[in-house]
């Protein structure tokens, strides 16, 4: 559970530093029953940050918080706690997990009442500039805001679809990166609103265009060195890197329910729109689920291409690391890399290559999640049970809906 907030006055700050901020956990879906509702927020003082878009007279700051039970133990339903647990396991093995996300989003117009739409008047595409890129000023304002908060922005540009943008920030340790993603999304939405726009992280807001992803670039360090690199290997990859890839491939289907959490997520994961479908890997080819970018040495990394920006970053990173560690611990063997463009192959051709595919719907993803006991163990019983219940409910509600497509296709004919 993430993406919630509570405000406190300045006179209350000292109490909150002593972890005395109580809230009603039963009022938030997925937390606890009403019989055990009292929960506490423990602020992480390292995450203190002034929000630059708020009035400078009477400034507003924020902390990321961990959730605890009244008896002083971490709440097992806190996704930040889940990530911390997996990071502790990695640390015991001598590893530091570094992550760099590629965050994509859309900037749409609002209607006369200020409500969001999925309308845009621009026709810009990949790497376009003004006057085609109508969102450039908003994107630049977002970047300047993030930089004032300590972000190191590595790149930003217009993406393939009209009104679609990407901003990449510097690699960092996983917990810091997950916190940064939460801050990033808040800043993007806030600054976009100032420009009269609505920022959407919905994976596929319109038919017929590319959806938005949140590719996860990751590496492991040990004793200050990137252990995914091995100059003696023909591809420059270490045995740990191959094992890590194998772990991701093994658990990719079960992870989909977390990495792609919405009904809409699976409208993005279709052939032809630069999103992965086939569970395989490549050194350069961008069509498989996993890609190894060309950089070697300290820059050697694995790019996991299925996650979308609707996903909880703490859980995504926890599962990516846990899957990779499973591969390393059990010395799983990665299949041969794929050089073909997987987007051009049929399902039958992919199956003939003994390559599996990602779930096609949220319902299939729920089934795969339920079958992957290792993934459930990583998340813990509380999150696994509550999350699966919520996603099953979401899927069943969607299946009962009558869409505009159905009305247009069937009403007149039948």
Predicted regions span which residues?
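Residues forming anionic-ligand binding surfaces in small-molecule and nucleic-acid pockets
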Residues: 45-73, 98-131, 147-173
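Acidic, His- and aromatic-enriched active-site or binding-groove loops in soluble protein domains
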Residues: 120-146, 174-185, 222-229, 234
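Catalytic-core signal marking the mid-to-C-terminal active-site face
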Residues: 183, 190-193, 197-198, 221-414
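Single conserved hydrophobic/aromatic residue that forms the stacking wall/gate
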Residues: 1-14
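Beta-rich nucleic-acid/ligand-interaction surfaces
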Residues: 107-108, 162-168, 203-216, 263-275
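Accessory "access/gating" subregions that flank catalytic or transport cores
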Residues: 131-135, 139-153, 167-174, 185-201, ...
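A generic structural motif
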Residues: 68-74, 131, 171-177, 224-226, ...
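Glycine-rich, N-terminal phosphate-binding loop and its surrounding beta-alpha-beta segment
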Residues: 12-90
